[in-house]
Amino acid sequence: MARRRIGQATLLFSSVGAARQSTLDKLLGLIDWAPVEHQLRDVSCSAKGEPAWPPLALFKAMLIAVWHDLSDVRLAEALDDRASFRRFCGFSAHEPTPERTAFVRLRAQLVAHGLNQALFEVVTDQLRAKAITVKTGTLVDATVIASASHADPEAGWAGHQRRKAIHSFKAHVGADADTDLVEALCVTPGNVHDGRAGGGALPEVFGEVYADSAYRGPIFGAAVAVRGGSPRIVQTSMWGRPGDDTLRKLRRWNYDIQRVRCRIEKIFGTWKRSYGLRRMRWRGLAKATLQVHLTAIAYNLRRSLTLLSNPAA
């Protein structure tokens, strides 16, 4: 397939800007992008009769869109205008950049080839190798994300106690308890119970598993046990006799779990507050899954950069 060659001309910057690395420059050097490019080798995002844009450049641009919560239109405008965006994607100073439809075609190709999981793994495996701590446990939880439209037949209604039901998808996430890096995830319609889908959010190595009371029951417990893990699940009741200290034991058990488990809420907060994942941008489970994987990749890159810069973060 014919592809454009980009980055051949020299980028021109002032001497002041050249001496100072931007966050995107640091992220560019954080991993080896060649394995990512290899995963994208069969992707073609060309319009009819035109050479295709390099898929790695478009993929990097979509990460920028996550970090800055940009629509396709605003991403195309920003990529044409900002030197740091061009540098990160590999474009030189004065060459043309992709129009918004190129990102639409890339998403369609990623969904068609089923590459979201492979891209997530090839990036996360590199970041995990840079981890400066020894894994001791895994945080598992789910977050509800409103669907792009109530007419989306692949979403489902999710309600909780007295809260208003939301037409949504649900992201089930497993994160490292020490680094807060997302290691595994799956996406389901919003009406799928956390405990039933939680097994899909377990990484290969997970140690003790911290989760809230929604994960009580045999299904999730069996998924943890079959891989040799140890479940640490919030309980709502405990057997005891009148007058003993059962209630105190229950509170202590839950406190020890909650003070670790609650850290996964910071991940969801970043996704929704900073990365715009309060609502799905596109209809359908496949595109919703792609959006969550892109968000997780972008989050892991930024989180790893923070950890390497400040191990105590």
Task: Please place each PLM-identified region on the residue numbering.
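Helix-centered, glycine/charged polyanion-binding patches within enzymatic domains
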Residues: 207, 213-286, 290-293
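Polybasic low-complexity intrinsically disordered regions
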Residues: 50, 64, 77-80, 90-91, ...
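Basic, short loop/linker segments at the boundary and entry of helix-turn-helix/winged-helix-like folds
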Residues: 17-68, 102
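Structural motif
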Residues: 48-56, 163, 283-291
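Charged, often Cys/His-bearing segments associated with DNA-binding zinc-finger transcription factors
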Residues: 1-34, 38, 304-313
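Short, well-ordered loop/turn and helix-capping segments at boundaries between secondary-structure elements
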Residues: 67, 81, 112, 226, ...
